[in-house]
A protein has these predicted regions:
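Bacterial N-terminal signal peptides that target proteins for export
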Residues: 2-12
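Short, ordered beta-strand-loop transition motifs
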Residues: 12, 81-83, 126, 350-351
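C-terminal motif of bacterial Sec signal peptides marking the signal peptidase cleavage site
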Residues: 20-23
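Extracytoplasmic soluble-region selector
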Residues: 25-114
């Protein structure tokens, strides 16, 4: 039988468009549009320790198929971030906040700044009142100003503020969050608390109390009770600084000898560890810091010409002589960070003209010129965090003694127009 191929081909060609049309549908979805980028509302952000802020992130293009954002923090010990982009500071430091969508990310470089606490006093024209400042603003008054009183040292542990000083009676005291925690002495003899340090929940204080013979005796208290009586009361002695390291209690101060000169000393657990000077000239040790098992002390020693010379000792031996001894100088506080030794104090740069100094590893790092260089000015305390150097003290002027905090090479805060800034503490947040 003969097949009619031409007719069959015509039928097939006529049916092909119908087949092709049947394979296409108006309901097919177009390819989804991907995310091109994520842009943060702020590329950088600074927060205080108790700070919060909400960031927003914009996903492009606007018609991207999936614009769902996922938020994360590179270090939740520094800051956390919620699913809505709310950042909550936890501890001073640096973290990267990331918003991610569709395989793309936007970032914000976050810095959480520490809180700066200062202990000192405010003069009202009649008396000094003991005061604590936080970030440049008065946090609390420890005394009522009816008698001269001074806050000499501040230490912050897990957000609790401890302060040491005297109440003007004068009774050596420790305050906790502005309220009296311990009266270290009974007020029958003059006493002062010079330094406070908190470790393992215990509160250590260094200072002195006069005995019945009118001689100051260097002491260390723990939780309000005498822990160590450092000297026997035969010669004048003062404990100026306390530091706890690996459970050991280090104290710096000075004690007189029979010739009437003071010897700079360091005690460990109540026993003399180092006599820093030989007693041929008077010397004072004001500050002790322990790092890597080494004991650093700052103070001064008089030379044979009767000039005080600022010095730093390490493990009982002179590490740095900070001035040449031609004119007076003094080192009041030492801090060790990342192996570098920072010291603050004052140096006479010409006859009766003074410069506030910060030294690093024995060399001048920062110099501050007081408003009136012929008036008494002083840097009392130093602290270092993240490479930034904080110092506290006061400048002399004809109108008073403005208490100030400096950061690196510039003034950070003027705390009061007439008073003293005795101690600075950089609080970085809760213990890890």
């Amino acid at each position: 039988m003969k097949t009619n191929y031409p007719i069959l081909r015509q039928i097939l060609f006529a049916a092909m468009p119908l087949v092709l049309l049947a394979g296409c549908s108006d309901t097919d979805d177009p390819a989804p549009i991907g995310v091109a980028g994520v842009e943060m509302s702020k590329p950088t952000l600074e927060l205080s320790l108790d700070g919060t802020e909400r960031l927003t992130a914009t996903v492009t293009p606007d018609n991207a198929a999936d614009k769902t954002l996922t938020w994360s923090s590179s270090d939740e010990a520094v800051a956390t971030v919620s699913s809505e982009g709310v950042i909550t500071a936890v501890r001073a430091g640096h973290a990267t906040i990331t918003a991610a969508a569709g395989g793309k990310t936007g970032t914000c470089a976050l810095t959480v700044n520490p809180d700066i606490y200062v202990a000192g006093s405010v003069y009202d024209g009649n008396n000094n009142a003991a005061v604590v400042w936080k970030n440049g603003k008065k946090l609390c008054s420890l005394t009522d100003g009816k008698q001269n009183a001074y806050a000499n040292s501040v230490f912050v542990s897990d957000g609790v503020v401890y302060t040491a000083g005297n109440d003007g009676k004068p009774v050596a005291k420790v305050w906790k969050d502005g309220t009296e925690l311990h009266a270290l002495t009974d007020g029958t003899q003059y006493a002062d608390a010079s330094s406070v340090f908190v470790s393992g929940g215990a509160v250590y204080t260094a200072g002195y109390e006069y005995n019945k013979n009118g001689t100051p005796v260097a002491k260390v208290w723990k939780d309000g009770t005498v822990l160590h009586t450092l000297t026997d009361g035969k010669q004048y002695a003062f404990a100026n600084s306390v530091f706890i390291s690996d459970g050991a209690v280090y104290t710096a101060g000075y004690e007189g000898n029979k010739n009437g000169w003071y010897i700079a000393k360091v005690w460990k657990d109540g026993t003399e560890l180092h006599a820093l000077t030989d007693g041929k000239q008077s010397a004072h040790a004001y500050s002790v810091f322990v790092s890597g098992g080494a004991v650093y002390t700052a103070g001064y020693e008089y030379n044979e010409n009767g000039k005080s010379v600022a010095k730093v000792w390490k493990d009982g031996t002179v590490l740095h002589t900070l001035a040449d001894g031609t004119l007076d100088s003094d080192a009041s506080s030492v801090y060790v960070a990342d192996g570098d030794v920072y010291v603050c104090g004052v140096e006479e740069v010409s006859e009766n003209v003074y410069m506030l100094q910060v030294w690093k590893n024995g060399k001048v790092l920062h110099s501050y010129t007081p408003a009136d260089q012929k008036e008494e000015s002083y840097l009392n305390s130093i602290s270092v965090w993240d490479g930034d150097v904080y110092t506290a003290g006061y400048e002399g002027s004809a109108d008073g003694y403005p208490a100030k905090v400096w950061k690196n090479d510039g003034e950070l805060y003027t705390l009061t127009e007439d008073g003293y800034a005795s101690s600075v503490f950089v609080y970085t947040g809760p213990e890890r």
